Regions:
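Hydrophobic alpha-helical segments with strong N-terminal bias
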Residues: 4, 17-18, 27, 177
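Mature N-terminal segment immediately following signal peptide/propeptide cleavage
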Residues: 32-56
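Bacterial N-terminal signal peptides that target proteins for export
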Residues: 1-8
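C-terminal segment of classical bacterial N-terminal signal peptides
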Residues: 13-23
Length: 263
């Protein structure tokens, strides 16, 4: 797997320089306009310093219909908490999380010492996102993000991630053939490109690096050592920053508490 190595400060400065765009490429809602959008976007990216080789990789992508289908069909976040927990296999995640907390105790102790984040929420996120690494996705990351940047629903949001992905490819931190989930997330805990630039530590296909990076993300979003992370408690806001879906946030908090020894 391609090694992911990052220099945070310079990356974010460069990413800021890449946007916003004064003349955005024309978005669309079907495959028909994707080729024309790529041509227009490529000109913008070239003007912002993206390399010819990376632009060629972008131009080689195909419209990711599976990504669009998945984006349109995210119904699990509309379930009740109990329904969501059952659908996502919460009892299995908690049981496996407890095992890993015990077997990988030194790793989690090190992470908690550095970032203040206990094992529970990290293991809950890991289990929820990829089944502890068993389901990391098999979509082309660049095609997925480019398709979503072209799609009119959230073009501005995914355009930022597309520029981040192009930057990571330019630097050799990601390969144009990188595989990931439907929305372009990569690694054991499913980082988007902008988050990789800001919080990524080493190869995110490696569990220890991904968990460390996840703890770094949570700390950067206000996690305080020793404070609670259930709804209404100080650290719940950091979980909210990880994923915008309320039912997901509550599930992570509940499973994390159970893994950490609560009920």
């Amino acid at each position: 797997m391609q090694r992911l190595a990052y220099v945070f400060g310079a990356s974010l400065v460069l990413l800021a320089a890449l946007g916003p765009r004064a003349h955005a490429a024309q978005c669309g809602n079907s495959a028909g306009g994707y080729a024309a959008w790529k041509q227009e976007f490529a000109g913008e990216a070239r003007a912002k310093g993206v390399s010819t080789a990376t632009i060629q990789a972008l131009m080689a992508t195909n419209y990711a219909q599976a990504t669009i289908n998945a984006d349109r069909g995210q119904r699990s976040f509309q379930l009740s908490l109990d329904q969501f927990l059952a659908k996502r296999g919460a009892s299995t995640i908690v049981a496996k999380g407890r095992q890993l907390k015990s077997s990988q105790g030194a790793l989690f102790a090190s992470i908690q010492s550095r970032y203040g984040v206990p094992p529970g929420p990290l293991l809950a996120i890991w289990g929820m996102e990829t089944g502890f690494g068993s389901q990391r996705g098999n979509q082309n990351m660049l095609a997925s993000i480019a398709t979503l940047a072209y799609d009119c629903r959230r073009s501005a949001y995914f355009t930022e991630h597309l520029y981040a992905a192009l930057q990571l490819i330019d630097r050799g931190a990601l390969s144009p053939s990188q595989r990931g989930s439907m929305h372009g997330e990569v690694g054991q805990t499913q980082f988007m490109p902008k988050a990789i630039l800001a919080y990524g530590t080493g190869n995110l296909e490696n569990a220890a690096n991904a968990l460390t990076s996840t703890a770094s993300f949570l700390k950067a979003h206000g996690w305080r050592a020793g404070a609670g992370y259930q709804p209404g408690e100080p650290n719940f806001a950091a979980i909210q920053a990880w994923n915008a879906a309320g039912v997901y946030q509550k599930a992570i908090a509940l499973m994390g508490r159970q893994i950490d020894g609560g009920e």
